[in-house]
Structure formats: structure tokens, C-alpha cells
Amino acid sequence: MKHSKIAALLCALAIAGVGVPSVWAEDTSAPVVNALKEADAAAQTADTAAKAPEVNYTDALLKGLSLTLPDVEKSVESGTFKNLSPEAPKPVVEQPAPEPEPLPEPEPEPEPEPEPEPAPAAKYTADQGDAANEIDSDGTYDGMTYISTKANENALRVSMAYISAKGDTITKSGDVDDVTNSDLYGKNAALLVTHGGHGAFSDTKISTTGNGAAGAYGYSKGTYINLTDSTVSTTGNFAPAAEAAEKAMMKLANTTASTTGYGSPAIKVSKNGGIILAENSHFTTTGQESHGVYTTGDVTLTGSTVNAQATKAAVIKNNDTLSLENSTLEGNETNSVPYNIVLYSDENAIGTMGTQQFNAKDSTIISHKGGMFLVTSTHGRVTLENTTIQQDPSLPVFTVTGNDGSFGWGDPGSNGGHMQLVLVKQELTGNILVDSISDVNMNITDSSTWNGAIHIVPNAQNGAAYHTNADIFIAAGSTWNLTEDSEVTTVTNLGTINYNGHTIKLADGTVMKG
């Protein structure tokens, strides 16, 4: 024990830097002392920047007396021996100033409550007046009687319902306060089917006596009226027998319709178009400006007759179609525009070639007064197939010209007519008149024959000349029999031209003759 205490003392002295007498050089603790010296020297070398302070030998001795040799050996082996000695104070490392804490983000202002969306605008803002009787539930309504004697009122209105009816009677009297609303929306009509309603009527009698009181009126896309084995009659002014607007559809089968008032067509398609189909039906008008057909939509007649006894047989406005098959279309114009069938467009709806059409197949067209066709202020296509045309032979069968603008048919001098005429298995007799701001493109095909002549005349309003005025194509097997000298822009002949002593003068000055 005494030996251990002495060794510990020596260790403490070594720590304090006190020299060890050589007398103890052979002591068993000498290797330890040497190791301590080496460790101390290494520590001093590593920390050359800071000079160790003066050692207090008394404190070191007292500390060393408390150690045993095993303690020192253990510390040396573990590498923690230096922790038993007083160490020089480490240099003070300046701590960086703490970063200021970020200011809290301001709380976002609450978003304002969105304003309520306005109610969607109604697709149709139609003034249709009142209804004495209204059906808005699907069902069958046979043998009913519907009457209205008040102004601006429908006798029966079918709205958003699918119904069928047989043997009904619908009677309307009383005038409309504004004929525009009766024409555009069906206000004051005897029967109004509207807003997607469907009405299938058979053996039904519809009659009206008021001004602006249409017989049957269909309004809006998705609306459908079917009249079968029925009669429709109107006696007031501006009272069409059958009318559709806003893309409504109507079909008449085995039905008779008549009007007697002014401006009351038998068949009318008005604002934004629609479709009317007539099968095995008969239509008559007796009033002035009461055309057999007046359409800004599509009308098809099959096995039917139309007779306008005091005005034009038909007026086709804008890019729309009138088609006849196995039918008769008859007119007797008594006013200032002596033509039986007129094709024209508003100046803001001028069509393109072929979009406005008149088609007749296996049919008869009769004009009791005036020429047959006037094409003005539009682009149109007329197709005749195996159809009989009856008119005054001294008048042109086709007049394709501008106009003076008095009817609102475009601007004078720039409102020419542009027509494509197609003959299919057709014999046509009559002349064609075209003015200098208009043109005719004529195709004689499928063994057709044209007996007539074509004349180009100056535009009455002195408009700038169109680049072409008359181009004639004669297919193989078809024939042109000249009845007078003619002027054309070009002729393409794959068939036969019989000059009959007449000539054809081309735009380049060439004169063709037999």
C-alpha cells in the first residue's frame, strides 16, 4: 500500500512538471512516468497557441495523493488521463448573436363572400300572352273543346308536355295588340305548342277570326306538332294557318288549311327557322300578300297542293329550302312584283351558292300572272326534275337581277342575284334574263332539254359588272334549242345545240352559230 502511495505521488509530481530523481529510474512505475511525460509533451505541442499558466505544486501534489497507480494506468489506457490534470483554459469562442425571431406573418384578411350569381337569362324571352287553357302534363285529351274570346290569348297552349288528342275543337276570336308578337312568338294563336312540348292532334278543327290569330303555331327547338286528318282556317289579317319559329317542327298529313285575310300565308316559317312537312294536304289563300308558302326555314310538300289566289305562290328568304315532290304550287301575283316564286336574302344574311334552294320533282308549278322565278340579292340553287311549268310564254321563266332596294333586298347596284340552275330529266321552255351584276350557272343534264334563250342586260342601278354573267354546260345526251339570239359568258357543250338560225355571242366576242 505504501508503495502504491509513493507511485501516485510521483505521478502527481510528473503532472505538475517536477523532475523525477534518477534513483527511481529503475522503479516499476518508470514506464508509466515516461508515458505521462510523452502525453504531456504532446498536449503542449497541440496547444502552442496558449501558454499554460504556472502550476500550483501543492494542489497537484494533493490531487496526486488521492490517486492510485491503477487509476492512472487505467486513465492512460483509456485516453482520458489528461482529464485528471488541470488543463489550460480554452480560448473563449465568441458566440454569434442570436438571430432575431421572425415577426409573425400577418393573418390574411378573410376573402369577401362571393356575390350571388345572377339567375341565368332565359333562353327565350317571348311575349306569348295568356292562355285560356294550358296543358303542362303528359296525357291524352280526346274530345275536348277549347275556346278563347279575349285579346292576346291562346285558346290552348301546350307547354313542355307530350300529349295526344283526337276529335278536339279549338276556336279563337279576339285580336292581338302587336302583330309582331303574334308572328314571332305565337301570341294570340288558337293552338300554341311551345318550349319543347309535343302535340299529336287528329280529327281536330282549328279556327280563328281575330287579327294576328294564327291557327296552329309551334315555338322553340324541340317543339313538335302533328296535325292529321284535321282542318285549319283563319279569317283575320296576319293570321297564318300553320306557322313554326325558333326551330320548331310541324307535320300536316291529310289536312286542309285556308286563310282569307291580308298577309296570312297558308304555311309560314318565321324567326330563326323551323321545319314544316306537308303530306297529302291542301292549302289555299285568298288575301293580298298571303303567299302559299313564306319561309325562312325548310318546307317540304309531298303529294300536296298550294294555291295562292291573289299573290305569289312562294317566297324563300335567306338560306332556306322549299322542296316539292308530286305536288302542285300555284300563284296569281296581283301586286307590283309580278313573279310567282321569289328567292331573296336580307343584306345581313346573304347566302352562298347552293345554300338557298328550291327543288321540284314530278311536280307542277303554275303562275297565273308574271314570270315564274325572281332571284335577287342572294345566292341560290334551283333544281327542276320532270316538273311542269305553266306561265305566260312572253315573260322570262327566270329573272336573275339586282333590284332598287325598295323592299329592303340589299343595296341598289350591289344586290345582284346569283343562281345555279340544274335540269334533271327536265324539259324547260322559256327565256332567262340576267343583268350585269348577276350571274347564272346553268347545267342541262340527264337527257334534259331547254327551249329558250338567255339575255344579259345592264344593271338598272348602274352597279359594277360581275366577273361572269352566264355559263352554260350541256351534258352528253342533253339539248339546248335556241329560240332567239343569246349572249353568254361561256358555253361547254358535250351534248347538242340546235341553233335554229340563231347565234350565241360569247364574252370574248366569239359568235357561235350552226
What kind of feature is each model-predicted range?
Residues D138-M144, Y162-D168, H198-D203, Y224-D229, ...:
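All-beta strand scaffolds that present successive hydrophobic residues in beta-strands
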Residues A121-D130, K150-R157, V179-L192, G210-G218, ...:
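Extracellular beta-strand/beta-solenoid scaffold signature
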Residues M144, S148, N154, A165-Y217, ...:
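Post-signal peptide N-terminal segment of secreted/secretory-pathway proteins
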Residues M1-A25:
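Gram-negative bacterial Sec-dependent N-terminal signal peptides
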Residues P21-K37, L62, V76, T80-K82:
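Signal peptide processing junction and immediate N-terminal pro/mature segment
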Residues Y466-I472, W480-T492, K505-L506:
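Surface-exposed loop/turn positions within long extracellular repeat scaffolds
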Residues F81, P116-V179, I504, V511-G514:
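N-terminal segments that cap or nucleate solenoid repeat domains
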Residues A41-E54, E87-A121:
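Acidic, proline-/serine-/threonine-rich low-complexity intrinsically disordered repeat tracts
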